[in-house]
């Protein structure tokens, strides 16, 4: 099989479980980050300067790219006989692909809020600390898919904000309800399928959860998500809370 199609399992068998195709913040990783940033900033500027009709087309186009990107991985793994339950689109970022689709169709504020508060920091962390490097090289379906889909997941809510949407700290309870309401069934699904969606059943292979494990131990690493989520929400809403106070004073 050509290296381009090889899954994590085949890579582990051929290269060893500790193999990584490129180092964090090495040349390849920095180039991926630079290209992603240029793409997001360029698209956001285009969106902001566009008419309502063009904005709608851009949003639909980004949604279509997200769905095609997700489908490409699923088909690639299935057609090469490498598909397993772990490729179900049930990580938080995968689920956000469908939240993007639902928002594009229905234009719901709760979707926009969840995408702003959870999707932006989650997808950004994934790009900054990728957990998909145990593949043969950067030129593989898994790596290209992972980088592109997370860049698109950052872009979509950035477009919403660039188009005038204003997040509100008052909607944080809705965001938390979505997060914990989806995590609970995922936790039990992981138990039955032997998967690791939301990184709730195995801390290893991901830099963030590995850090939680180093601090809290393997048994309690999940508790690390609580302060991490609180910090992410604080940082995401701080600018809007400060802006709201300025307007009240004025």
PLM segments and residue spans:
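N-terminal topogenic module of multi-pass integral membrane proteins
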Residues: 1-56
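Membrane-interface transmembrane-helix boundary segments in multi-pass integral membrane proteins
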Residues: 17-35, 177, 181, 191-233
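Structural signature of hydrophobic alpha-helical transmembrane segments
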Residues: 29-35, 81-93, 116
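Hydrophobic core of alpha-helical transmembrane segments in multi-pass integral membrane proteins
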Residues: 30-48, 66-71, 183-187, 226-238
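Alpha-helical transmembrane segments in multipass membrane proteins, preferentially the mid-helix core
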Residues: 41-45, 100, 152-169
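Membrane-interface helix-boundary motifs at transmembrane edges
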Residues: 46-59, 105-113, 163-173
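Aromatic-anchored segments of alpha-helical transmembrane domains
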Residues: 65-75, 119-131, 179-190
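Membrane-proximal helix-loop-helix units in multi-pass membrane proteins
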Residues: 105-156
């Amino acid at each position: 099989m050509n290296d381009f199609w090889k899954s994590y399992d085949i890579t582990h068998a051929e290269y060893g479980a500790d193999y990584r195709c490129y180092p964090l913040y090495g040349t390849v990783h920095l180039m991926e980050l630079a290209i992603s940033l240029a793409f997001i900033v360029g698209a956001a500027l285009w969106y902001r300067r566009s008419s309502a009709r063009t904005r709608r087309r851009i949003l639909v186009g980004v949604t279509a790219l997200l769905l095609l990107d997700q489908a490409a991985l699923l088909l690639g793994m299935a057609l090469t006989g490498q598909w397993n339950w772990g490729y179900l689109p049930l990580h938080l970022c995968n689920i956000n692909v469908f939240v993007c689709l639902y928002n594009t169709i229905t234009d719901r504020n709760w979707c926009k809020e969840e995408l702003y508060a959870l999707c932006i920091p989650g997808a950004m962390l994934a790009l900054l600390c990728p957990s998909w490097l145990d593949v043969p090289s950067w030129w593989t379906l898994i790596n290209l898919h992972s980088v592109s889909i997370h860049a698109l997941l950052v872009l979509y809510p950035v477009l919403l904000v660039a188009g005038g949407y204003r997040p509100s700290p008052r909607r944080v309870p809705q965001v938390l309800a979505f997060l914990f309401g989806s995590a609970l069934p995922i936790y039990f699904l992981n138990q039955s399928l032997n998967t690791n969606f939301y990184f709730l059943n195995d801390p290893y292979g991901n830099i963030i959860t590995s850090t939680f494990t180093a601090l809290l131990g393997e048994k309690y690493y999940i508790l690390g998500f609580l302060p991490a989520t609180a910090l992410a929400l604080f940082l995401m809403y701080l600018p809007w809370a400060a802006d709201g106070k300025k307007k009240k004073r004025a």
